[in-house]
């Protein structure tokens, strides 16, 4: 024998009208000493499902007065970014503009191929001026 219960929940909200949820619960009713309890078990089951569903949707609780400015305080979420905004180059200048004439910065000892001592001297700085 299957018992059907119609469970209506009124969820109070901080702003706006209360939200009304209606569930139909089917509970198989066994006969004998191991019989399933009636209406209280159905209500407890629905409340447990509703709480677990609600816990998965809520963000972490924030303490009042500890807003670090990282999250928007309004209810509207930020608009999703489009692909063109996400695919910017990591550096604003092309590769050659980041290099000094003698090769990569920080690699002053090894000059770029095809360049002489003058190219290296431009990268090394004041110690490469020679005697005097």
Swiss-Prot record:
It holds the Pfam family P19Arf_N. Residues 1-64 are annotated as: Interaction with CDK5RAP3 and MDM2. It is found in: Nucleus, Nucleolus; Nucleus, Nucleoplasm. Ubiquitinated in normal cells by TRIP12 via the ubiquitin fusion degradation (UFD) pathway, a process that mediates ubiquitination at the N-terminus, regardless of the absence of lysine residues. Ubiquitination leads to its proteasomal degradation. In cancer cells, however, TRIP12 is located in a different cell compartment, preventing ubiquitination and degradation. Keywords: Apoptosis, Cell cycle, DNA-binding, Mitochondrion, Nucleus, rRNA processing, Transcription, Transcription regulation, Tumor suppressor, Ubl conjugation, Ubl conjugation pathway. GO terms for biological process: amyloid fibril formation; apoptotic signaling pathway; autophagy of mitochondrion; cellular senescence; mitochondrial depolarization; negative regulation of B cell proliferation; negative regulation of cell population proliferation; negative regulation of immature T cell proliferation in thymus. Its main location: nucleus. Transmembrane segments: none annotated. Residues 103-117 have a biased composition (Gly residues). Residues 84-99 have a biased composition (Basic residues). Residues 56-132 are annotated as: Disordered. Residues 71-83 have a biased composition (Low complexity). InterPro entries: Tumor_suppres_ARF. GO terms for molecular function: disordered domain specific binding; DNA binding; MDM2/MDM4 family protein binding; p53 binding; RNA polymerase II-specific DNA-binding transcription factor binding; SUMO transferase activity; ubiquitin ligase inhibitor activity; ubiquitin-protein transferase inhibitor activity. One of its GO terms (cellular component) is nucleus. Does not interact with cyclins, CDK1, CDK2, CDK4, CDK5 or CDK6. Binds to BCL6, E2F1, HUWE1, MDM2, MYC, NPM1/B23, TOP1/TOPOI and UBE2I/UBC9. Interacts with TBRG1 and COMMD1. Interacts with CDKN2AIP and E4F1. Interacts with CDK5RAP3 and MDM2; form a ternary complex involved in regulation of p53/TP53. Interacts with NOP53; the interaction is direct and promotes ARF nucleoplasmic relocalization and ubiquitin-mediated proteasomal degradation. Interacts with TTF1 (via the N-terminal region (NRD) and a C-terminal region); the interaction is direct and inhibits the nucleolar localization of TTF1. Capable of inducing cell cycle arrest in G1 and G2 phases. Acts as a tumor suppressor. Binds to MDM2 and blocks its nucleocytoplasmic shuttling by sequestering it in the nucleolus. This inhibits the oncogenic action of MDM2 by blocking MDM2-induced degradation of p53 and enhancing p53-dependent transactivation and apoptosis. Also induces G2 arrest and apoptosis in a p53-independent manner by preventing the activation of cyclin B1/CDC2 complexes. Binds to BCL6 and down-regulates BCL6-induced transcriptional repression. This is Tumor suppressor ARF. It comes from Homo sapiens.
């Amino acid at each position: 024998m299957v018992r059907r219960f119609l469970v209506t929940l009124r969820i109070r909200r901080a702003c706006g009208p209360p939200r009304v949820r209606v569930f139909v619960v089917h509970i198989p009713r066994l006969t004998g000493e191991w019989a399933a309890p009636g209406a209280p078990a159905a209500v407890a089951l629905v409340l447990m499902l509703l709480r677990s569903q609600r816990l998965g949707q809520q963000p972490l609780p924030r303490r009042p007065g500890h807003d670090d400015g990282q999250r928007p305080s309004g209810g509207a979420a930020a608009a999703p970014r489009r692909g063109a905004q996400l695919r910017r180059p990591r550096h604003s200048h092309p590769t050659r503009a980041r290099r000094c004439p003698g090769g990569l910065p920080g690699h002053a000892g090894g000059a770029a191929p095809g360049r002489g001592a003058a190219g290296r001297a431009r990268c090394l700085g004041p110690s490469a001026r020679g005697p005097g």
